């Protein structure tokens, strides 16, 4: 009889542990979902900022000539940085 009661107690504890684990796993998914949303939001902001910067290459011209070249290539021209300004020369 004592062995049967121990089995019931262990089965009850195991069931409670299982329910608790499943509950915590659900909370973990919520937290991971929120983190994933924030990462996606940050990625979108960085991508939009990068596109804005490359579309206005004169802001990056003193630092990186490649921005000016890419900006002017989109306009089918040759780009050259001159005194903090990107100048596009049509061919």
From Swiss-Prot:
UniProt keywords, alphabetically: Antibiotic, Antimicrobial, Disulfide bond, Ion channel impairing toxin, Neurotoxin, Potassium channel impairing toxin, Secreted, Signal, Toxin, Voltage-gated potassium channel impairing toxin
Keyword tRNA-binding: no
Domain of life: Eukaryota
Secretion signal span: 1-25
Single GO term (MF): potassium channel regulator activity
UniProt note on tissues of expression: Expressed by the venom gland.
Main location as per UniProt: secreted
GO biological process terms held by the UniProt record: defense response to bacterium
PROSITE patterns: BSPN_CSAB
Disulfide bonds: 61-81, 68-86, 72-88
UniProt domain BetaSPN-type CS-alpha/beta: residue ranges: 58-91
Propeptide position ranges: 26-42
Extra facts: Almeida et al., 2013 suggested naming this protein TstKMK, where KMK represents the first three N-terminal residues of the mature chain. However, Batista et al., 2007 identified a mature chain that begins two residues upstream of KMK.
Family classification: Belongs to the long chain scorpion toxin family. Class 2 subfamily.
Functional description taken from the UniProt entry: The full peptide presents antibacterial and cytotoxic activities. The synthetic C-terminus (AA 33-76) inhibits voltage-gated potassium channels Kv1.1/KCNA1, Kv1.2/KCNA2, and Kv1.3/KCNA3.
Protein name: Potassium channel toxin TstKMK
């Amino acid at each position: 009889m004592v062995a049967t009661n121990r089995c019931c107690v262990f089965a009850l504890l195991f069931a409670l542990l299982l329910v608790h684990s499943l509950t915590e796993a659900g909370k973990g998914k919520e937290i991971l979902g929120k983190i994933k949303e924030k990462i996606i939001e940050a990625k979108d902001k960085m991508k939009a900022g990068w596109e804005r910067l490359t579309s206005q290459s004169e802001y990056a011209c003193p630092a990186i000539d490649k921005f000016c070249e890419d900006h002017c290539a989109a306009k089918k021209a040759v780009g050259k940085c001159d005194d903090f300004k990107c100048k596009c020369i049509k061919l």
